Amino acid sequence: MVLIKVLANLLILQLSYAQKSSELIIGGDECNINEHRFLVALYTSRTLFCGGTLINQEWVLTAAHCNMEDIQIKLGMHSKKVPNEDEQKRVPKEKFFCLSSKNYTLWDKDIMLIRLDSPVKNSAHIAPLSLPSSPPSVGSVCRTMGWGRISSTKETYPDVPHCVNINLLEYEMCRAPYPEFELPATSRTLCAGILEGGKDTCVGDSGGPLICNGQFQGIASWGDDPCAQPHKPAAYTKVFDHLDWIENIIAGNTDASCPP
């Protein structure tokens, strides 16, 4: 059964699909402390519920279904228990969605741009990740990461982010297992995973990056639950297809429209 991988109050989608806002990495290893300077953690109260990506000193890109009230954003974090000296905290100044109705049930509009309340400073553990200069290719080896669940069946969450390498697959590989959802034949969504299973994002990883050949190509969006099942890869919002919208919003054109 597929369900939204966020918190219960995000089930406004009225779908039983696994949106990975609460997902973690399955089948990976602890990330090196120096390999995720762009990775941010989204908190509400004391709960880490999503990831995101710092794309410049003032903007974070994440999934639309990660939107919640009272979001706090931690940058430069590795261990949840032992803070880095250069960690910084911010809150959203503005949030922008590809659809004004925030109706990300269209599957390929699960993207949110957050303007921080003040710019961050680069440091040993904080630096932005550039937007992609070209689209990704099927067959690419991609890396994804997050503080999400590390067990597909148990509520086991790590202290530090986990990283895993997965493959970029044809979109149909994500569409075919779920005929009941009548997903569109084409989509601005990337499909990534390991067909034999065992490696995947999971609950708590939503909003985090998918990096293919060194470029930021995807935002963790939805997948099956339990995670990492054979022939059930996960879906990621395609960053490249939203470049014009992202760049227009950052430039101050808040009326910018999403790609059709």
Swiss-Prot record:
Peptidase S1 domain spans which residues?
25-251
UniProt KW Disulfide bond keyword: yes
Q: Where in the cell is it found?
A: Secreted
Domain of life, source organism: Eukaryota
Q: What is its EC number?
A: 3.4.21.-
Record-level GO cellular component terms: extracellular region; secretory granule
Q: Which residues does the Swiss-Prot or TrEMBL record annotate as the active site?
A: H65 (charge relay system), D110 (charge relay system), S206 (charge relay system)
Q: In the UniProt record, which residues carry a glycan?
A: N103
Whom does it interact with, and what assembly results?
Monomer.
Function text: Snake venom serine protease that may act in the hemostasis system of the prey.
**Which family, according to the similarity comment?**
Belongs to the peptidase S1 family. Snake venom subfamily.
Q: Which protein, by its recorded name, is this?
A: Snake venom serine protease pallabin-2
Encoding gene, per UniProt annotation:
JZTHR7
